[in-house]
């Protein structure tokens, strides 16, 4: 095996998906603890930056105390290199969250044991399904009252349409939480709470049918054995291929706060989740072990340092290796650039990167030339697919406070749209500018950034738009007919694509019925 193939085989790149407050932040910290990378990485840190600024580097994040931006953390674990991509978990997140899922090979779903499957989890799972991403599940908060575990598994299967295979099974919960039983390997992992940054030594009881197990479970023993028989009869067994195909999820139980069960999940990612996978480009399929470098940009983050109008483009490496100072071709622009200062997202010690391999995420300094979906290679003209725009769910009309600044407004919105902070639509029948977003917070982010970076003050007005759909139609004549009939609701997005702004769900359904030759798409590839 070449050194490069060996490095790729060591990589595991995954994201955590959850509803807000299911415990994602806590589990992220505990995962870093497992990797001993406890210089808790938020985003790229400079040595001088204080801890507070680590992750919440935008003013607004500081005020609200939430992390809007998706950060990347790399840490070693069991001779592997883990790349963990965090996704904003706040009530309001953005398209960034969705797009981050295009850059990973697997995902960890965290559920609150007291609440089960929640709306945000469903939305994120839908995105994972676009690429059949393998999912590992962690049912959290066993140190509190939780719902019946069998009920939780049924809910995962019914709502998320994925088979659930329990790997561990909880023994009690809340004050009676005694640990978990490993179904396949027949041993008990005893619960001892390890708070903060301690890693507690794991105590194991071999075999459920033992005096030690009977003593540990006490009066609960008989009932637990009965419950297990029921579970083993009713639940799916783990199947590696079904997991890789995104059809089955292994389920673990624990408490991130009590630092229990998190290592089981990380072991599952290392043992079962795929190493960096081949990626499909328009021209061909790119294998990770290929010698030549290639990668795509899935996210752009602004102002990591408020003093500079600097933006960092996050790139997933798909093949080859990055070496400091190497020359890359920026395919969309057809230009060669030398990259000497890519950033890595390791602990604070290593901020300038010397080398990186397929599966790793690197940060490129971007002075306005890089867009989401851009491909970088060692010369070959490739364009990776599968980095979509998602139809916004919320819309506002922009009102400018100073009409003389309309040029700055358009310029600012154009850049923020390229970055993925918002989507912008220009209706064909008016001079309005309409913004679309996935979470309300995106509108606040745009307003504050327009003010800080472009000195433009704007306000928002409500507008009757239910959803947006990108229009495709192979038949030119039909398309023309459609455009004439639907002109009141047609707009062009920031990339110049024809978009239908549906005022209501019913209206959209009627239009789709009336115009069978016209495709109304809910996602659009970056080109």
Curated annotation (Swiss-Prot):
The keyword GTP-binding applies. Transmembrane segments: none annotated. HAMAP family: Rel_fac_3 (MF_00072). InterPro entries: EF-G-like_DII, EFG_III/V, G_TR_CS, P-loop_NTPase, PrfC, RF3_C, RF3_dom_3_sf, RF3_GTP-bd. This is Peptide chain release factor 3. One of its GO terms (cellular component) is cytosol. GO terms for biological process: regulation of translational termination. CDD domains: RF3, RF3_II, RF3_III. Disulfide bonds: none annotated. It comes from Pseudomonas savastanoi pv. phaseolicola (strain 1448A / Race 6) (Pseudomonas syringae pv. phaseolicola (strain 1448A / Race 6)). The keyword Cytoplasm applies. It is found in: Cytoplasm. Residues 9-277 form the tr-type G domain. Keywords: Cytoplasm, GTP-binding, Nucleotide-binding, Protein biosynthesis. Belongs to the TRAFAC class translation factor GTPase superfamily. Classic translation factor GTPase family. PrfC subfamily. GTP binds at residues 18-25, 86-90, 140-143. GO terms for molecular function: GTP binding; GTPase activity; guanosine tetraphosphate binding; translation release factor activity, codon nonspecific; translation release factor activity, codon specific. Increases the formation of ribosomal termination complexes and stimulates activities of RF-1 and RF-2. It binds guanine nucleotides and has strong preference for UGA stop codons. It may interact directly with the ribosome. The stimulation of RF-1 and RF-2 is significantly reduced by GTP and GDP, but not by GMP.
């Amino acid at each position: 095996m070449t050194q490069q193939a060996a490095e790729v085989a060591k990589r595991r790149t995954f994201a955590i998906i959850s509803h807000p407050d299911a415990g994602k932040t806590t589990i992220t910290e505990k995962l870093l603890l497992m990797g001993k990378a406890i210089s808790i990485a938020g985003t790229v840190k400079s040595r001088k930056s204080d801890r507070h600024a680590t992750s919440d580097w935008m003013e607004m994040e500081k005020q609200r105390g939430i992390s809007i931006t998706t950060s990347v953390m790399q840490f070693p674990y069991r001779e592997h290199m883990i790349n963990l991509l965090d996704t904003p978990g706040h009530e309001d997140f953005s398209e960034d969250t969705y797009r981050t899922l295009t850059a990973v090979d697997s995902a960890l779903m965290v559920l609150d044991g007291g609440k089960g499957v929640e709306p945000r989890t469903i939305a994120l799972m839908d995105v994972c399904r676009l690429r059949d991403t393998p999912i590992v599940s962690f049912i959290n908060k066993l140190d509190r009252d939780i719902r019946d575990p069998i009920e939780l598994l049924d809910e995962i299967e019914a709502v998320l349409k994925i088979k659930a295979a329990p790997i561990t099974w909880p023994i009690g919960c809340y004050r009676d939480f005694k640990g978990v039983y490993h179904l396949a390997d027949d041993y008990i992992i005893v619960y001892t709470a390890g708070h903060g940054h301690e890693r507690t030594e794991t105590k194991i009881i071999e075999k459920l049918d033992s005096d030690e197990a009977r003593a540990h479970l006490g009066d609960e023993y008989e009932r637990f054995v009965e419950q297990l028989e029921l579970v083993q009869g009713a639940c799916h067994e783990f199947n590696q291929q079904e997991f890789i195909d995104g059809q089955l999820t292994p389920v673990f139980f624990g408490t991130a706060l009590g630092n229990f069960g998190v290592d089981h999940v990380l072991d599952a990612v290392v043992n079962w989740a795929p190493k960096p996978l081949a990626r499909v480009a328009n021209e061909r399929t790119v294998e990770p072990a290929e010698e030549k470098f290639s990668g795509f940009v899935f996210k752009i983050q602004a102002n990591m340092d408020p003093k500079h109008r600097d933006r960092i483009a996050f790139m997933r490496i798909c093949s080859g290796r990055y070496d400091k100072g190497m020359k890359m071709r920026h395919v969309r622009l057809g230009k060669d650039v030398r990259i000497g200062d890519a950033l890595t997202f390791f602990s604070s010690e290593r901020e300038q990167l010397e080398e990186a391999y397929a599966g790793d995420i690197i940060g490129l300094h971007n002075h306005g030339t890089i867009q989401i979906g851009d491909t970088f290679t060692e010369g070959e003209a490739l364009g990776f697919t599968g980095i979509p725009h998602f139809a916004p769910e919320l819309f506002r009309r922009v009102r400018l406070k100073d009409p003389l600044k309309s040029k700055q407004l358009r310029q600012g919105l154009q850049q923020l749209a390229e970055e993925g902070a918002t989507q912008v639509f220009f209706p064909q029948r008016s001079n309005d500018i309409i913004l679309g977003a996935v979470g309300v917070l995106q509108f606040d982010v745009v307003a504050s950034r327009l003010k800080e970076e472009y000195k433009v003050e704007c306000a928002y007005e409500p507008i009757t738009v239910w959803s947006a759909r990108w229009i495709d139609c192979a038949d030119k004549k039909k398309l023309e007919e459609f455009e004439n009939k639907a002109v009141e609701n047609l707009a062009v997005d920031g990339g110049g694509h024809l978009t239908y702004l549906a005022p209501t769900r019913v209206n959209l359904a009627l239009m789709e019925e009336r115009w069978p030759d016209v495709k109304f798409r809910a996602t659009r590839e970056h080109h």
